[in-house]
């Protein structure tokens, strides 16, 4: 295991002092020079520690007064520490979790993995050496860091999964109603006359949330007596094994262009493609456009998430909206219930809804 940097050691010591009640919400923290002397470290180290605490929304600064611990000072007793580990890119998860925490004498340090298993691993290794009460995690890979997550459970630290879980882990999961959302968007395409409907997944080895979306796609076609066709299922290759963001982007780009090449070679190409998320939908629309295939005139494309990329350019993407805020709130509530030894359900579904825009149209076959 890697040696912990000095600023992280100071950070974790301050977290322990918060947890044990030695520092209370509203308390003024010692100044930079006091902390330098206390921990025998440089000013740069203390500033990095303060930046980390501030980035986790644990402290706030008052001009000409000092730095204070965030939260409501009327709470009594030791504060709970429940870190949130997320890929990043969707701030609603963190803001919602922190809103719940401020009402429950709890602190939520936020760690972003940038969707990289290696960075997620670094955060988990650090947290295993910290005195925390529970962990909420949105995993960025399907099973890559299962050894570390099992370490939390072995230490009797509750783990709550957000959006997607790990196979074999008996931990609560807070996720969107992915199956319902994908089913409804496929039904919308069928109502518009489409029967040749393809599916674009991130990977053949799907996350649990993506498995549910794919299940909704398959079951809806079967329900409407539309045959499933192997050649209509597309995915990128080995995305779960890519270590860097550059490698991920390259793999995505190759996969989208290969999908378009496969499309052009088909005797009976699909008239619509359901994508597992909005980023895939937007990239696929771009790849189709490079080949002279227009959306929605030549092909309909749908997404999932209702992220900013869905409306970033024409055509705006018909998609399934998730309530990221509700998911963040519920995940933190479940973690708090586990800390209090309350019984909780294993799966908590958050409702989804269809957002109709420009990227699909009616056809006649």
State what each model feature region is.
Residues 1-76:
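N-terminal helix-turn-helix DNA-binding module of bacterial transcription factors
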Residues 13, 253, 257-365:
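Flexible loop/turn connectors
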Residues 25-26, 195-196, 228-232, 294-300:
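Short acidic capping loops at alpha-helix termini that bridge into adjacent secondary structure
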Residues 185-227, 347-359:
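An alpha-beta-alpha
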Residues 172-200, 215-219, 252-261, 322-340:
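Hydrophobic alpha-helical segments within soluble ligand-binding/sensing domains
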Residues 83-84, 132-139, 160, 198-201, ...:
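Periplasmic-binding protein-like
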Residues 2, 12-16, 34, 51, ...:
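Alpha-helical recognition/docking segments in bacterial nutrient-uptake
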Residues 101-113, 218-248:
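Short beta-strand elements in bilobed, periplasmic/extracellular small-molecule ligand-binding domains
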């Amino acid at each position: 295991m890697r040696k912990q940097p000095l600023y992280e050691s100071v950070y974790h010591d301050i977290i322990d002092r918060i947890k044990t009640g030695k520092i209370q919400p509203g308390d003024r923290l010692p100044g930079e020079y006091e902390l330098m002397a206390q921990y025998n470290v440089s000013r740069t180290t203390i500033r990095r520690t303060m930046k980390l605490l501030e980035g986790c929304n644990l402290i706030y600064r008052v001009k000409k007064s000092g730095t204070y611990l965030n939260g409501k000072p009327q709470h009594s007793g030791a504060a709970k520490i429940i870190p949130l580990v997320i890929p990043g890119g969707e701030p609603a998860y963190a803001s919602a979790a922190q809103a719940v925490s401020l009402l429950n004498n709890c602190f939520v340090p936020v760690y972003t993995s940038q969707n990289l298993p290696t960075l997620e691993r670094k955060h988990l290794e650090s947290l295993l050496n910290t005195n925390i009460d529970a962990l909420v995690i949105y995993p960025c890979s399907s099973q890559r860091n299962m050894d570390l997550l099992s370490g939390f459970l072995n230490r009797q630290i509750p783990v709550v999964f957000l959006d997607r879980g790990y196979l074999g882990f008996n931990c609560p999961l807070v996720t969107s109603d992915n199956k319902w959302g994908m089913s409804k968007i496929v039904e919308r395409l069928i109502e518009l006359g489409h029967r040749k409907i393809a599916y674009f997944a991130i990977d053949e080895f799907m996350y649990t949330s993506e498995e549910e979306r794919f299940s909704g796609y398959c079951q809806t076609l079967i329900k409407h007596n539309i045959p499933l066709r192997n050649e209509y299922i597309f995915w990128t290759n080995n995305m779960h094994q890519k270590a860097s963001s550059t490698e991920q982007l390259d793999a995505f780009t190759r996969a989208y262009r290969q999908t378009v090449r496969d499309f052009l070679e088909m005797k009976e190409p699909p008239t619509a493609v359901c994508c597992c998320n909005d980023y895939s939908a937007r990239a696929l629309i771009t790849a189709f456009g490079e080949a002279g295939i227009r959306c929605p005139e030549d092909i309909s494309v749908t997404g999932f998430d209702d992220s900013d990329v869905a409306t970033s350019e024409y055509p705006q993407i018909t998609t399934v909206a998730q309530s990221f805020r509700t998911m963040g709130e519920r995940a933190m509530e479940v973690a708090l219930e586990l800390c209090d030894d309350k019984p909780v359900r294993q799966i908590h579904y958050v409702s989804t809804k269809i957002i109709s825009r420009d990227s699909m149209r009616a056809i006649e076959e």
